[in-house]
């Protein structure tokens, strides 16, 4: 049992580790990412925008006029965050429904910079990885042992949320499977009824034809 909990903790650590990447977009392009998040879980997004400089053939810190419009939608397609940020920043939101959350980003630049190439560095942190424990320890004046206990409690809480989310996904999958099986069954029955009716109609038609020709 203890080994199972250790394996589960390792898997969750891998799933909720920081997701650091960068991508290239034009200033009129919209880029979206999907993050599966349990309910009541904090998500922190760090980003930095760089502007392509043709003179140096590289990316430089973007101009002050270039920022990023960030929009976040939950699994019910409800907008939970929509705001314009500067070219470098940090944003956070808390999920209230489990499921896929869509994070979309696009530039708010004016026509002066239209057509330029941007490089966006993105770092998404979910769950306990979104907590700055150094700041927590300093703010609450925690000892090293107290801080470690706090981290363990947060990890246990995150594991519980993840388990609840997995059960939620299993229930949705089971409901979808049952609904699909039911539709397949009714469709098969409908096809059978149609075939029987067509066969009966053809037999009646042939019988009438033979009677008309006085073959029966």
From Swiss-Prot:
Q: What does this protein do?
A: Eca and bai are essential, though not redundant, for dorsoventral patterning of the embryo. Specifically required during early embryogenesis for the activity of maternal tkv, while the zygotic tkv is not affected.
Q: Which Gene Ontology terms describe the biological processes this protein takes part in?
A: dorsal/ventral pattern formation
**Which stretches are annotated as coiled coil?**
134-164
- Upper classification of the organism: Eukaryota, Metazoa, Ecdysozoa, Arthropoda, Hexapoda
Q: Which gene encodes it?
A: eca
* Subcellular location per the Swiss-Prot or TrEMBL entry: Endoplasmic reticulum membrane
The stretch of residues making up the signal peptide is 1-20
The protein's name in its UniProt record: Transmembrane emp24 domain-containing protein eca
Which parts of the chain does the record assign to the membrane side Lumenal?
Answer: 21-183
The entry's family comment says: Belongs to the EMP24/GP25L family.
Which keywords does this Swiss-Prot/TrEMBL entry list? Coiled coil, Developmental protein, Endoplasmic reticulum, Membrane, Signal, Transmembrane, Transmembrane helix
Report if keyword Coiled coil is assigned: yes
Q: What would be one Pfam family of this protein?
A: EMP24_GP25L
Q: Would the keyword Cell wall biogenesis/degradation turn up in this protein's UniProt record?
A: no
- The organism named in the record is Drosophila mojavensis
């Amino acid at each position: 049992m203890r080994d199972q909990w250790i394996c589960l903790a390792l898997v969750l650590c891998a799933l909720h580790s920081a997701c650091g990447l960068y991508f290239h977009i034009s200033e009129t392009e919209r880029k979206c990412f999907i993050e599966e998040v349990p309910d009541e879980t904090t998500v922190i997004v760090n980003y930095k925008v760089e502007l392509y400089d043709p003179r140096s053939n590289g990316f430089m810190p973007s101009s002050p006029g270039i920022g990023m419009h960030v929009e976040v939608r939950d699994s019910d397609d409800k907008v939970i965050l929509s705001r314009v940020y500067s070219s470098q920043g940090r944003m956070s939101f808390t999920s209230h429904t489990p499921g896929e959350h869509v994070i979309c980003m696009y530039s708010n630049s004016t026509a002066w910079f239209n057509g330029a190439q941007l490089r966006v560095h993105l770092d998404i942190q979910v769950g306990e990885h979104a907590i700055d424990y150094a700041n927590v320890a300093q703010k609450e004046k925690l000892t090293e042992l107290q801080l470690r206990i706090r981290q363990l409690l947060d990890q246990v809480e995150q594991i519980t949320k993840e388990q609840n989310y997995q059960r939620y996904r299993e229930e949705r999958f089971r409901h979808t499977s049952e609904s699909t099986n039911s539709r397949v069954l009714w469709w098969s029955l409908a096809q059978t009824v149609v075939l029987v009716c067509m066969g009966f109609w053809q037999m009646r038609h042939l019988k009438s034809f033979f009677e008309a020709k006085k073959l029966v």
